[in-house]
Amino acid sequence: GLVGSEMCIRDRAKQEADFVIVFPHWGTEDELSPDESQLRWAQEMADAGADLIIGGHPHTLQPTGLLTAADGRDVLVYYSLGNFLSHQKEMINLLGGMASVTIVKDKDGTRVEEYELKPTINVILRDPASGWYDYRPMLLEDYTPELAAQNRFPDCTVEAVSYTHLRAHETV
């Protein structure tokens, strides 16, 4: 928990801000689910005044969750958005997500009104003319069997990638 000057800073920040977004660097690399530390810290951050938590570090896409803060607010948590652009070689590391969050402010306060996660994949294609690799982050919905066949990592079929994404993005 927060004590002393940390508590004063937090309270002052909350007074000055309409909405607090926290970007923790946390989690266990290559895990598809948040670990106990992430779950505990997410709740502590929510209770301390965070309105939205967007995590990173595990290099994998992890679930999205809604927490109830101590004051009753709903707090959206993206535990990890994975890699947007990467040269890691495992399928779980080639997947990521782009978060889209609509924040509204009205007479009742400021809150998340809508949110979604658009799954992405790193496609790595070899340029036949130069021999260089071309790295292309793209939406998973645009990933075709033709692109999968050209991908540097042949295990990344559309079916395998879609299954891995569904497994990684179960809601906590």
Residue ranges: model-predicted function:
Residues 13-33:
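Short acidic, glycine-rich surface-loop motifs adjacent to enzyme active sites
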Residues 5, 27-33, 85-90:
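Acidic/histidine-rich helix-loop elements
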Residues 5-6, 10-20, 40:
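Binuclear metal-dependent hydrolase catalytic cores centered on His/Asp/Glu-rich metal-binding motifs
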Residues 36-99:
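Conserved beta-sheet core of the metallophosphoesterase superfamily
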Residues 93-167:
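A short C-terminal boundary segment appended to hydrolase-like catalytic domains
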